[in-house]
From Swiss-Prot:
Localization per record: Virion; Host nucleus
Keywords for the protein's UniProt record, in alphabetical order: Capsid protein, Helical capsid protein, Host nucleus, Host-virus interaction, Ribonucleoprotein, RNA-binding, Viral nucleoprotein, Viral penetration into host nucleus, Virion, Virus entry into host cell
Species assigned in the record: Influenza A virus (strain A/Fowl plague virus/Rostock/8/1934 H7N1)
Function recorded in the entry: Encapsidates the negative strand viral RNA, protecting it from nucleases. The encapsidated genomic RNA is termed the ribonucleoprotein (RNP) and serves as template for transcription and replication. The RNP needs to be localized in the host nucleus to start an infectious cycle, but is too large to diffuse through the nuclear pore complex. NP comprises at least 2 nuclear localization signals that are responsible for the active RNP import into the nucleus through cellular importin alpha/beta pathway.
Protein name as it appears in the record: Nucleoprotein
């Protein structure tokens, strides 16, 4: 993965830039988030939101969704061509929550998309600032990853619901670009490809004609993105097979599911970025912080520092636990839905519990929920330490990929073992090693069998004090090796439905 000389860093993808040095990257990422902040401040002015209302995460999400919808070219075109009852294709809006006489009230607002686009461009020096839009998409995606389980989607494509740790970014829109592709998990890419192949099986014309040629290019591009996430030669060779198939069908689906399972142990490279809600950037800009001059990074100390000094509120339903709501948002902010809970707990400084034990539903409030009983509370988004976000799967030394619980996709570059029940995972690999990919399958299974749960990943990497911004003295946490930490263990969360 690192061998390609043309690799751009994630921040470069994030900002659509060509190769830049560290200072330029920090400046362009800073420019991106300050544009988001300026846009948010302007929207709060337009909507006449009080300071408290502007810090409400639900209001932030509505404003973010409005700008994403205003710039969704494809959907806008579709809405113009297929007018549906009661939907004005030129308008966008959502619920805004205001404090009236000691109660929260919901107000549905509607704006011209053109107007929203104007405000956004104005906040971004007249540019479209696609990078900022992608950044908001990734924040929404990270929030979905922490909030919902994708069991149904997994089962529909023939995958095992226990592979949920491979599903990072599964709700990202197609138009999220290179930065979006970087944060998608192996399972997400596999699922997108399987859906495509199934359409081809059911629809004779899917791969044919002018449209079919474009479809084919998209298919091969997705295969290459997935191939780039794998770190072993055998996995990559199998991806070449899938990509080059004349007429993708069930054999390719089998291969893809096999590869997804193999990724539970031979983990793929998936990027992690701390993308924060727009209101957080708004608060910082309003307080006079100059992101562009100071520079900003999505994978270093900056987001932690920002969250240490930001007060964000959330609406709370009658029987929800505010501490649990905070954990959910903290995990979303750091893209840590698939991280080992032992590591997250250590960094956060308070115990992070599996989702099955959370007394909280999602952050967004449905339009039919009763506002009378709604309360609000401060989200506790601070941390005890900070750690560098990783873009690798935490596999030990070169080709030998290490172990993963059923399973984690590490977010933080912190030394730990990656416990896993090899028997459980290997049981999924019975039988079928014949066919074109037999030698690769055999090789992959051999590598998985030789992976040891006690191997240590990210050797010598540690967390840092919040005062240690240059990351000079790593603190390597001692983690309870016996206690594996899967967030989705014993899960009862709601499904994600569009």
């Amino acid at each position: 993965m690192a061998s390609q000389g043309t690799k751009r860093s994630y921040e470069q993808m994030e900002t659509g830039g060509e190769r830049q040095n560290a200072t330029e990257i920090r400046a362009s990422v800073g420019r991106m988030v300050s544009g988001i902040g300026r846009f948010y401040i302007q929207m709060c002015t337009e909507l006449k939101l009080s300071d408290y209302e502007g810090r409400l995460i639900q209001n932030s999400i509505t404003i973010e969704r409005m700008v994403l919808s205003a710039f969704d070219e494809r959907r806008n075109r579709y809405l113009e061509e297929h007018p549906s009852a009661g939907k004005d294709p030129k308008k966008t809006g959502g619920p805004i929550y205001r404090r009236r006489d000691g109660k929260w009230v919901r107000e549905l607002i509607l704006y011209d998309k053109e107007e929203i686009r104007r405000i956004w461009r104005q906040a971004n020096n007249g540019e479209d600032a696609t990078a900022g839009l992608t950044h908001l998409m990734i924040w929404h995606s990270n929030l979905n990853d922490a909030t919902y389980q994708r069991t149904r989607a997994l089962v529909r494509t023939g995958m095992d619901p226990r592979m949920c740790s491979l599903m990072q970014g599964s709700t990202l829109p197609r138009r999220s670009g290179a930065a979006g592709a970087a944060v998608k998990g192996v399972g997400t890419m596999v699922m997108e490809l399987i859906r495509m192949i199934k359409r081809g099986i059911n629809d004779r014309n899917f791969w044919r004609g002018e449209n079919g040629r474009r479809t084919r290019i998209a298919y091969e591009r997705m295969c290459n993105i997935l191939k780039g996430k794998f770190q072993t030669a055998a996995q990559r060779a199998m991806m070449d097979q899938v990509r080059e198939s004349r007429n993708p069908g069930n054999a390719e689906i089998e291969d893809l599911i096999f590869l997804a399972r193999s990724a539970l142990i031979l983990r793929g490279s998936v990027a992690h970025k701390s993308c924060l809600p727009a209101c957080v950037y708004g608060l910082a800009v309003a307080s006079g912080y100059d992101f562009e001059r100071e520079g900003y990074s999505l994978v270093g100390i900056d987001p932690f520092r920002l969250l240490q000094n930001s007060q964000v509120f959330s609406l709370i339903r009658p029987n929800e636990n505010p501490a649990h709501k905070s954990q959910l948002v903290w995990m979303a902010c750091h893209s840590a839905a698939f991280e080992d809970l032992r590591v997250s707990s250590f960094i956060r400084g308070t115990r992070v519990v599996p989702r099955g034990q959370l007394s909280t539903r999602g952050v967004q409030i449905a339009s039919n929920e009763n506002m009378e009983t709604m309360d609000s509370s401060t989200l506790e988004l601070r941390s005890r330490y900070w750690a560098i976000r990783t873009r690798s799967g935490g596999n030990t030394n070169q080709q030998r990929a290490s172990a993963g619980q059923i399973s984690v996709q590490p977010t933080f570059s912190v030394q730990r073992n990656l416990p896993f029940e090899r028997a459980t995972i290997m049981a999924a690999f019975t039988g079928n090693t014949e066919g074109r990919t037999s030698d690769m399958r055999t090789e992959i299974i051999r590598m998985m069998e030789s992976a040891r749960p006690e191997d240590v990943s990210f050797q010598g990497r540690g967390v840092f004090e919040l005062s240690d911004e240059k990351a000079t003295s790593p603190i390597v946490p001692s983690l309870d090796m016996s206690n594996e930490g899967s967030y989705f263990f014993g899960d009862n969360a709601e499904e994600y439905d569009n």
